[in-house]
């Protein structure tokens, strides 16, 4: 399980260095084999271990290519999916098309989200957090049953 937000640098070759606290888990889960794709709703990337991504691929394969919405999701997620191998120094090379999609420049936020990471441009991440907090503070919508059961 991945949690927390960490600032990492994107080097001139388009690589990020995975924080050491995650490396053992990633090596045990997938021998450092990762898959990165776009997020359909946010300007960020999604980074999965290969076994986690394979679960998603099975779900995507079950969608109908005859349904335009389902085909669109398949095209976007699978079409942007890029395998990346963590090297011995803990670095991952991110495809240039993915970096461009998320607007990643020098400083990147690596955000743990249970079974995956999100990769955000640092400034976009902090702006999104401000917007999310404001939305929660001003929301008039009733909480879902699942959120009502959440006790912090």
Swiss-Prot record:
GO terms for cellular component: cytoplasm; nucleoid. One of its GO terms (molecular function) is DNA-binding transcription factor activity. It is found in: Cytoplasm, Nucleoid. It comes from the Bacteria. Residues 5-52, 81-124 form the SpoVT-AbrB domain. InterPro entries: MraZ (IPR003444), MraZ_C (IPR035644), MraZ_dom (IPR020603), MraZ_N (IPR035642), MraZ_sf (IPR038619), SpoVT-AbrB_dom (IPR007159), SpoVT-AbrB_sf (IPR037914). Pfam families: MraZ. The keyword Coiled coil does not apply. Forms oligomers. PANTHER family: TRANSCRIPTIONAL REGULATOR MRAZ. HAMAP family: MraZ (MF_01008). Belongs to the MraZ family. This is Transcriptional regulator MraZ. It comes from Proteus mirabilis (strain HI4320).
């Amino acid at each position: 399980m991945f949690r927390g937000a960490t600032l990492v640098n994107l080097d001139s070759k388009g690589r990020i260095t995975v924080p050491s606290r995650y490396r053992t888990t990633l090596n045990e889960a997938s021998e450092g084999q990762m898959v990165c794709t776009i997020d359909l709703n946010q300007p960020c990337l999604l980074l999965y271990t290969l076994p986690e991504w394979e679960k998603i691929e099975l779900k995507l394969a079950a969608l109908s290519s005859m349904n335009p919405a389902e085909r669109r999701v398949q095209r976007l997620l699978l079409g942007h999916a890029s395998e990346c191998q963590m090297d011995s120094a803990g670095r991952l090379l991110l495809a240039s098309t993915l970096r461009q999609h998320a607007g990643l420049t020098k400083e990147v936020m690596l955000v743990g989200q249970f079974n995956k990471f999100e990769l955000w441009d640092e400034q976009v991440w902090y702006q999104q957090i401000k917007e999310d907090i404001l939305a929660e503070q001003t929301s008039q919508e009733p909480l879902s049953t699942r959120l009502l059961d959440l006790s912090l």
